[in-house]
Amino acid sequence: MFRRIFLFDEDSLNSSVTSYTNASQSTTTIMDYSLKSSDTQGSSSGIFTDHPGLNPCSERIVELQYDIRLKLGALMPKESAQKVLEASEALHGESNNIAFLEYLLEDLQQNGVGGEAYKDAVDLSKDLVSSPLEQFEIISLIPMKIGNLYFSFTNPSLFMLLTLSLVLLLVYFVTKKGGGNSVPNAWQSLVELIYDFVLNPVNEQIGGLSGNVKQKFSPRISVTFTFSLFCNPQGMIPYSFTVTSHFLITLGLSFSIFIGITIVGFQKNGLHFLSFLLPAGVPLPLAPFLVLLELIPYCFRALSSGIRLFANMMAGHSSVKILSGFAWTMLCMNDLLYFIGDLGPLFIVLALTGLELGVAISQAHVSTILICIYLNDAINLHQSASFFIIEQKRV
Protein backbone atom coordinates (compact mmCIF):
# COMPACT_ATOMS: atom_id res chain seq x y z
CA MET A 1 0.00 0.00 0.00
CA PHE A 2 1.34 3.39 -0.94
CA ARG A 3 0.61 6.78 0.54
CA ARG A 4 -0.33 9.24 -2.16
CA ILE A 5 -0.83 13.01 -2.24
CA PHE A 6 -3.45 14.51 -4.55
CA LEU A 7 -4.46 18.12 -5.10
CA PHE A 8 -8.08 19.24 -4.64
CA ASP A 9 -9.76 22.61 -4.34
CA GLU A 10 -11.14 23.84 -1.03
CA ASP A 11 -14.77 23.67 -2.22
CA SER A 12 -14.52 19.99 -3.03
CA LEU A 13 -13.15 19.20 0.42
CA ASN A 14 -15.78 21.11 2.39
CA SER A 15 -18.96 20.51 0.42
CA SER A 16 -20.66 18.00 -1.85
CA VAL A 17 -20.83 20.35 -4.81
CA THR A 18 -20.74 18.35 -8.00
CA SER A 19 -19.10 21.00 -10.12
CA TYR A 20 -15.36 20.68 -10.55
CA THR A 21 -12.90 23.57 -10.43
CA ASN A 22 -9.15 23.77 -10.89
CA ALA A 23 -7.19 22.30 -7.99
CA SER A 24 -4.65 24.70 -6.58
CA GLN A 25 -5.04 25.48 -2.90
CA SER A 26 -4.94 22.47 -0.58
CA THR A 27 -3.76 18.88 -0.29
CA THR A 28 -5.10 15.71 1.22
CA THR A 29 -3.32 12.45 1.96
CA ILE A 30 -5.07 9.18 1.18
CA MET A 31 -4.37 5.47 1.11
CA ASP A 32 -4.88 3.59 -2.16
CA TYR A 33 -6.78 0.78 -0.54
CA SER A 34 -9.59 3.23 0.20
CA LEU A 35 -10.44 3.05 -3.48
CA LYS A 36 -11.34 -0.61 -3.18
CA SER A 37 -14.52 0.16 -1.24
CA SER A 38 -17.31 -0.32 -3.80
CA ASP A 39 -20.01 1.18 -1.66
CA THR A 40 -18.26 4.57 -1.55
CA GLN A 41 -17.04 5.01 -5.11
CA GLY A 42 -19.00 7.54 -7.12
CA SER A 43 -21.11 8.76 -4.21
CA SER A 44 -21.47 12.37 -3.21
CA SER A 45 -20.87 11.45 0.41
CA GLY A 46 -17.21 10.90 -0.40
CA ILE A 47 -14.89 7.88 -0.35
CA PHE A 48 -12.54 9.12 2.39
CA THR A 49 -13.49 9.32 6.03
CA ASP A 50 -11.25 12.32 6.63
CA HIS A 51 -12.95 14.32 3.84
CA PRO A 52 -16.64 13.29 3.69
CA GLY A 53 -17.48 16.17 1.34
CA LEU A 54 -15.20 15.03 -1.51
CA ASN A 55 -17.26 15.53 -4.67
CA PRO A 56 -17.69 12.92 -7.44
CA CYS A 57 -15.35 14.75 -9.83
CA SER A 58 -12.46 14.52 -7.39
CA GLU A 59 -13.32 10.89 -6.68
CA ARG A 60 -13.19 10.18 -10.40
CA ILE A 61 -9.70 11.71 -10.63
CA VAL A 62 -8.45 9.48 -7.84
CA GLU A 63 -10.06 6.39 -9.39
CA LEU A 64 -8.51 7.07 -12.79
CA GLN A 65 -5.03 7.63 -11.35
CA TYR A 66 -5.36 4.43 -9.33
CA ASP A 67 -6.57 2.44 -12.38
CA ILE A 68 -3.64 3.75 -14.43
CA ARG A 69 -1.22 2.49 -11.81
CA LEU A 70 -2.93 -0.92 -11.70
CA LYS A 71 -2.83 -1.23 -15.48
CA LEU A 72 0.84 -0.27 -15.62
CA GLY A 73 1.53 -2.84 -12.91
CA ALA A 74 -0.09 -5.52 -15.07
CA LEU A 75 1.98 -4.41 -18.07
CA MET A 76 5.20 -4.35 -16.00
CA PRO A 77 5.13 -7.69 -14.14
CA LYS A 78 8.89 -7.78 -13.61
CA GLU A 79 9.14 -4.30 -12.12
CA SER A 80 8.82 -3.58 -8.41
CA ALA A 81 5.78 -1.81 -7.00
CA GLN A 82 7.90 1.30 -6.40
CA LYS A 83 9.00 1.40 -10.06
CA VAL A 84 5.39 1.03 -11.23
CA LEU A 85 4.32 3.84 -8.92
CA GLU A 86 7.07 6.12 -10.26
CA ALA A 87 6.13 5.31 -13.86
CA SER A 88 2.43 6.03 -13.29
CA GLU A 89 3.14 9.32 -11.52
CA ALA A 90 5.53 10.36 -14.28
CA LEU A 91 2.86 9.52 -16.88
CA HIS A 92 -0.15 11.37 -15.52
CA GLY A 93 1.82 13.95 -13.49
CA GLU A 94 -0.86 14.10 -10.78
CA SER A 95 -3.09 15.72 -13.40
CA ASN A 96 -6.66 16.68 -12.48
CA ASN A 97 -7.84 16.69 -16.11
CA ILE A 98 -10.40 13.90 -16.28
CA ALA A 99 -10.42 13.74 -20.09
CA PHE A 100 -6.63 13.39 -20.18
CA LEU A 101 -6.64 10.66 -17.52
CA GLU A 102 -9.40 8.76 -19.35
CA TYR A 103 -7.38 8.96 -22.56
CA LEU A 104 -4.29 7.51 -20.83
CA LEU A 105 -6.27 4.68 -19.26
CA GLU A 106 -8.05 3.87 -22.52
CA ASP A 107 -4.76 3.79 -24.42
CA LEU A 108 -3.23 1.43 -21.84
CA GLN A 109 -6.24 -0.87 -21.95
CA GLN A 110 -6.55 -1.02 -25.73
CA ASN A 111 -2.94 -0.87 -26.95
CA GLY A 112 -1.01 -2.25 -23.95
CA VAL A 113 2.78 -2.16 -24.29
CA GLY A 114 2.49 -0.97 -27.88
CA GLY A 115 0.56 2.13 -26.99
CA GLU A 116 1.82 5.66 -26.73
CA ALA A 117 0.92 5.95 -23.04
CA TYR A 118 3.01 2.92 -22.06
CA LYS A 119 6.02 4.14 -24.05
CA ASP A 120 5.74 7.59 -22.47
CA ALA A 121 5.58 6.05 -19.00
CA VAL A 122 8.73 4.01 -19.63
CA ASP A 123 10.61 6.95 -21.15
CA LEU A 124 9.60 9.40 -18.43
CA SER A 125 10.46 6.98 -15.62
CA LYS A 126 13.97 6.55 -17.05
CA ASP A 127 14.61 10.27 -16.63
CA LEU A 128 13.93 10.09 -12.90
CA VAL A 129 17.02 10.24 -10.70
CA SER A 130 17.36 7.00 -8.75
CA SER A 131 17.91 7.27 -5.04
CA PRO A 132 21.21 5.95 -3.62
CA LEU A 133 19.12 4.35 -0.86
CA GLU A 134 17.39 2.00 -3.32
CA GLN A 135 20.14 -0.55 -2.72
CA PHE A 136 18.83 -0.97 0.84
CA GLU A 137 15.24 -1.68 -0.23
CA ILE A 138 13.72 -4.81 1.31
CA ILE A 139 11.99 -6.90 -1.37
CA SER A 140 9.60 -9.72 -0.58
CA LEU A 141 10.73 -12.78 -2.56
CA ILE A 142 8.27 -15.34 -1.17
CA PRO A 143 5.23 -13.60 0.37
CA MET A 144 3.82 -15.36 3.42
CA LYS A 145 1.01 -14.00 5.56
CA ILE A 146 -0.78 -15.57 8.53
CA GLY A 147 -3.63 -13.37 9.66
CA ASN A 148 -2.19 -9.91 10.18
CA LEU A 149 1.38 -11.22 10.56
CA TYR A 150 3.85 -11.23 7.68
CA PHE A 151 6.54 -13.93 7.45
CA SER A 152 7.75 -13.15 3.94
CA PHE A 153 11.09 -14.46 2.74
CA THR A 154 12.96 -11.29 1.77
CA ASN A 155 16.29 -10.43 0.21
CA PRO A 156 17.98 -9.89 3.64
CA SER A 157 16.91 -13.43 4.58
CA LEU A 158 18.33 -14.75 1.32
CA PHE A 159 21.72 -13.10 1.74
CA MET A 160 21.96 -14.12 5.40
CA LEU A 161 21.38 -17.73 4.34
CA LEU A 162 23.98 -17.36 1.60
CA THR A 163 26.48 -15.97 4.11
CA LEU A 164 25.81 -18.80 6.53
CA SER A 165 26.13 -21.39 3.76
CA LEU A 166 29.40 -19.86 2.57
CA VAL A 167 30.93 -19.94 6.06
CA LEU A 168 29.77 -23.51 6.72
CA LEU A 169 31.11 -24.71 3.38
CA LEU A 170 34.45 -23.02 4.04
CA VAL A 171 34.79 -24.65 7.46
CA TYR A 172 33.61 -28.02 6.12
CA PHE A 173 36.13 -28.21 3.29
CA VAL A 174 38.93 -27.14 5.62
CA THR A 175 38.13 -29.69 8.36
CA LYS A 176 36.75 -32.59 6.31
CA LYS A 177 40.03 -34.53 6.64
CA GLY A 178 39.89 -34.58 10.40
CA GLY A 179 41.33 -31.23 11.41
CA GLY A 180 43.03 -30.03 8.25
CA ASN A 181 46.40 -30.62 6.66
CA SER A 182 49.71 -30.47 8.49
CA VAL A 183 50.81 -28.04 5.79
CA PRO A 184 47.84 -25.66 5.50
CA ASN A 185 46.59 -24.51 2.14
CA ALA A 186 45.20 -21.03 1.48
CA TRP A 187 41.67 -21.78 2.71
CA GLN A 188 42.88 -23.49 5.86
CA SER A 189 45.20 -20.57 6.54
CA LEU A 190 42.23 -18.21 6.22
CA VAL A 191 40.18 -20.15 8.79
CA GLU A 192 43.15 -20.37 11.17
CA LEU A 193 43.80 -16.65 10.74
CA ILE A 194 40.19 -15.84 11.68
CA TYR A 195 40.41 -18.09 14.73
CA ASP A 196 43.70 -16.57 15.92
CA PHE A 197 42.41 -13.08 15.19
CA VAL A 198 39.50 -13.63 17.59
CA LEU A 199 41.55 -15.50 20.20
CA ASN A 200 44.03 -12.65 20.67
CA PRO A 201 41.46 -10.03 21.82
CA VAL A 202 39.85 -12.63 24.09
CA ASN A 203 43.16 -13.26 25.86
CA GLU A 204 44.12 -9.57 25.96
CA GLN A 205 40.83 -7.93 26.95
CA ILE A 206 39.31 -10.46 29.36
CA GLY A 207 41.14 -10.78 32.67
CA GLY A 208 40.69 -12.71 35.89
CA LEU A 209 40.15 -16.07 34.16
CA SER A 210 42.39 -18.93 33.16
CA GLY A 211 43.17 -19.55 29.52
CA ASN A 212 40.85 -22.56 29.28
CA VAL A 213 37.92 -20.60 30.70
CA LYS A 214 38.56 -17.70 28.33
CA GLN A 215 38.54 -20.01 25.34
CA LYS A 216 34.98 -21.02 26.17
CA PHE A 217 33.91 -17.60 24.92
CA SER A 218 35.96 -17.82 21.72
CA PRO A 219 33.45 -19.85 19.63
CA ARG A 220 30.61 -17.45 20.43
CA ILE A 221 32.71 -14.40 19.64
CA SER A 222 34.09 -16.08 16.50
CA VAL A 223 30.57 -16.60 15.16
CA THR A 224 29.75 -12.91 15.60
CA PHE A 225 33.04 -11.80 14.07
CA THR A 226 32.71 -14.13 11.07
CA PHE A 227 29.11 -13.11 10.44
CA SER A 228 30.04 -9.41 10.42
CA LEU A 229 33.20 -10.06 8.41
CA PHE A 230 31.27 -11.70 5.58
CA CYS A 231 28.11 -9.54 5.71
CA ASN A 232 29.70 -6.08 5.87
CA PRO A 233 31.66 -6.16 2.56
CA GLN A 234 28.86 -8.08 0.85
CA GLY A 235 27.25 -4.88 -0.41
CA MET A 236 30.36 -4.04 -2.44
CA ILE A 237 29.47 -6.89 -4.82
CA PRO A 238 27.16 -5.71 -7.65
CA TYR A 239 23.51 -6.77 -7.35
CA SER A 240 24.01 -7.96 -3.78
CA PHE A 241 22.49 -6.72 -0.53
CA THR A 242 24.14 -5.34 2.61
CA VAL A 243 22.47 -7.18 5.48
CA THR A 244 24.05 -5.03 8.19
CA SER A 245 22.76 -1.81 6.60
CA HIS A 246 19.40 -2.26 8.34
CA PHE A 247 19.09 -1.10 11.92
CA LEU A 248 16.68 -3.85 12.99
CA ILE A 249 19.21 -6.53 12.01
CA THR A 250 22.16 -4.87 13.75
CA LEU A 251 20.00 -4.04 16.77
CA GLY A 252 18.85 -7.65 17.04
CA LEU A 253 22.45 -8.83 16.88
CA SER A 254 23.74 -6.33 19.46
CA PHE A 255 20.75 -6.78 21.77
CA SER A 256 21.14 -10.57 21.86
CA ILE A 257 24.84 -10.17 22.68
CA PHE A 258 23.98 -7.63 25.38
CA ILE A 259 21.52 -10.07 27.01
CA GLY A 260 24.08 -12.89 26.85
CA ILE A 261 26.79 -10.77 28.48
CA THR A 262 24.39 -9.73 31.25
CA ILE A 263 23.52 -13.39 31.91
CA VAL A 264 27.25 -14.24 32.10
CA GLY A 265 27.72 -11.41 34.61
CA PHE A 266 24.97 -12.75 36.88
CA GLN A 267 26.29 -16.32 36.57
CA LYS A 268 29.79 -15.22 37.54
CA ASN A 269 28.97 -12.72 40.32
CA GLY A 270 25.36 -13.37 41.31
CA LEU A 271 23.49 -10.35 42.67
CA HIS A 272 26.87 -8.74 43.39
CA PHE A 273 26.90 -8.01 39.64
CA LEU A 274 24.58 -5.07 40.37
CA SER A 275 27.30 -3.46 42.50
CA PHE A 276 28.78 -1.82 39.40
CA LEU A 277 25.79 0.54 39.45
CA LEU A 278 26.95 2.11 42.72
CA PRO A 279 30.66 2.81 43.38
CA ALA A 280 31.94 2.23 46.89
CA GLY A 281 31.90 5.13 49.33
CA VAL A 282 29.11 7.07 47.64
CA PRO A 283 26.89 9.08 50.04
CA LEU A 284 23.41 7.63 50.38
CA PRO A 285 21.54 10.75 49.09
CA LEU A 286 23.48 10.54 45.81
CA ALA A 287 22.87 6.81 45.36
CA PRO A 288 19.63 7.03 43.30
CA PHE A 289 21.15 9.51 40.87
CA LEU A 290 24.38 7.55 40.41
CA VAL A 291 22.50 4.28 39.92
CA LEU A 292 20.45 5.91 37.18
CA LEU A 293 23.55 7.46 35.59
CA GLU A 294 25.30 4.08 35.51
CA LEU A 295 22.26 2.12 34.35
CA ILE A 296 21.47 4.30 31.33
CA PRO A 297 24.94 3.99 29.70
CA TYR A 298 24.96 0.26 30.41
CA CYS A 299 21.61 -0.27 28.66
CA PHE A 300 22.63 2.00 25.79
CA ARG A 301 25.48 -0.34 24.92
CA ALA A 302 23.09 -2.51 22.94
CA LEU A 303 21.66 0.51 21.11
CA SER A 304 25.00 2.17 20.38
CA SER A 305 26.56 -1.01 18.98
CA GLY A 306 23.67 -1.49 16.57
CA ILE A 307 23.62 2.16 15.49
CA ARG A 308 27.39 2.27 14.91
CA LEU A 309 27.40 -0.71 12.55
CA PHE A 310 24.21 0.32 10.74
CA ALA A 311 25.31 3.95 10.27
CA ASN A 312 28.78 3.04 8.97
CA MET A 313 27.43 0.56 6.43
CA MET A 314 24.61 2.77 5.13
CA ALA A 315 26.68 5.96 4.94
CA GLY A 316 29.67 4.30 3.30
CA HIS A 317 27.72 2.34 0.69
CA SER A 318 25.56 5.39 -0.13
CA SER A 319 28.66 7.54 -0.68
CA VAL A 320 30.13 4.98 -3.06
CA LYS A 321 26.84 4.82 -4.99
CA ILE A 322 26.54 8.61 -5.30
CA LEU A 323 30.11 9.17 -6.50
CA SER A 324 29.93 6.16 -8.83
CA GLY A 325 26.81 7.56 -10.46
CA PHE A 326 28.48 10.96 -10.79
CA ALA A 327 31.56 9.45 -12.44
CA TRP A 328 29.45 7.33 -14.80
CA THR A 329 27.38 10.36 -15.86
CA MET A 330 30.51 12.29 -16.74
CA LEU A 331 31.96 9.29 -18.57
CA CYS A 332 28.86 8.98 -20.75
CA MET A 333 29.13 12.59 -21.94
CA ASN A 334 30.57 13.02 -25.42
CA ASP A 335 32.59 16.11 -24.58
CA LEU A 336 36.34 15.44 -24.50
CA LEU A 337 36.80 17.88 -21.62
CA TYR A 338 34.34 15.95 -19.49
CA PHE A 339 36.09 12.69 -20.34
CA ILE A 340 39.47 14.06 -19.24
CA GLY A 341 37.99 15.57 -16.11
CA ASP A 342 36.30 12.28 -15.31
CA LEU A 343 39.60 10.70 -14.29
CA GLY A 344 39.40 12.63 -11.03
CA PRO A 345 36.01 11.23 -9.99
CA LEU A 346 37.09 7.75 -11.06
CA PHE A 347 40.13 7.88 -8.80
CA ILE A 348 37.95 9.21 -5.97
CA VAL A 349 35.49 6.35 -6.45
CA LEU A 350 38.34 3.83 -6.49
CA ALA A 351 39.84 5.27 -3.30
CA LEU A 352 36.45 5.44 -1.60
CA THR A 353 35.72 1.84 -2.57
CA GLY A 354 38.95 0.69 -0.95
CA LEU A 355 38.21 2.82 2.10
CA GLU A 356 34.69 1.40 2.41
CA LEU A 357 36.05 -2.14 2.10
CA GLY A 358 38.49 -1.40 4.91
CA VAL A 359 35.73 0.12 7.05
CA ALA A 360 33.52 -2.91 6.49
CA ILE A 361 36.27 -5.26 7.67
CA SER A 362 37.36 -3.03 10.55
CA GLN A 363 33.79 -2.83 11.86
CA ALA A 364 33.87 -6.58 12.45
CA HIS A 365 37.10 -6.14 14.42
CA VAL A 366 35.68 -3.22 16.42
CA SER A 367 32.60 -5.26 17.31
CA THR A 368 34.81 -8.10 18.54
CA ILE A 369 36.91 -5.78 20.71
CA LEU A 370 33.80 -4.22 22.25
CA ILE A 371 32.28 -7.62 23.01
CA CYS A 372 35.47 -8.64 24.82
CA ILE A 373 35.52 -5.36 26.79
CA TYR A 374 31.88 -5.76 27.78
CA LEU A 375 32.54 -9.35 28.83
CA ASN A 376 35.46 -8.25 30.97
CA ASP A 377 33.27 -5.59 32.62
CA ALA A 378 30.57 -8.16 33.36
CA ILE A 379 32.96 -10.76 34.75
CA ASN A 380 35.35 -8.51 36.65
CA LEU A 381 32.94 -5.62 37.39
CA HIS A 382 34.77 -2.91 35.40
CA GLN A 383 38.31 -3.98 36.31
CA SER A 384 40.55 -3.95 33.25
CA ALA A 385 42.58 -6.92 32.10
CA SER A 386 45.83 -4.98 32.72
CA PHE A 387 44.96 -4.93 36.44
CA PHE A 388 45.13 -8.72 36.58
CA ILE A 389 48.37 -8.80 34.60
CA ILE A 390 49.98 -6.44 37.14
CA GLU A 391 48.66 -8.54 40.03
CA GLN A 392 50.08 -11.72 38.50
CA LYS A 393 53.50 -10.07 38.13
CA ARG A 394 53.46 -9.00 41.79
CA VAL A 395 52.72 -12.54 42.89
UniProtKB/Swiss-Prot annotation:
CDD domains named among the record's database cross-references: ATP-synt_Fo_a_6 (cd00310)
Any Gene Ontology CC annotation: proton-transporting ATP synthase complex
Record-linked PROSITE patterns: ATPASE_A
Keywords of the record: ATP synthesis, CF(0), Hydrogen ion transport, Ion transport, Membrane, Mitochondrion, Mitochondrion inner membrane, Transmembrane, Transmembrane helix, Transport
One GO MF term attached to the UniProt entry: proton transmembrane transporter activity
Protein's membrane topology: Multi-pass membrane protein
Subcellular location: Mitochondrion inner membrane
GO terms of biological process kind: proton motive force-driven ATP synthesis
Membrane spanning stretches: 153-173, 246-266, 273-293, 313-333, 339-359
Subunit structure: F-type ATPases have 2 components, CF(1) - the catalytic core - and CF(0) - the membrane proton channel. CF(1) has five subunits: alpha(3), beta(3), gamma(1), delta(1), epsilon(1). CF(0) has three main subunits: a, b and c.
Role description: Mitochondrial membrane ATP synthase (F(1)F(0) ATP synthase or Complex V) produces ATP from ADP in the presence of a proton gradient across the membrane which is generated by electron transport complexes of the respiratory chain. F-type ATPases consist of two structural domains, F(1) - containing the extramembraneous catalytic core and F(0) - containing the membrane proton channel, linked together by a central stalk and a peripheral stalk. During catalysis, ATP synthesis in the catalytic domain of F(1) is coupled via a rotary mechanism of the central stalk subunits to proton translocation.
PANTHER family: ATP SYNTHASE SUBUNIT A
Membership in a protein family: Belongs to the ATPase A chain family.
Name this polypeptide is given: ATP synthase subunit a
Biological source species: Nicotiana tabacum (Common tobacco)
Organism placement in taxonomy: Eukaryota, Viridiplantae, Streptophyta, Embryophyta, Tracheophyta
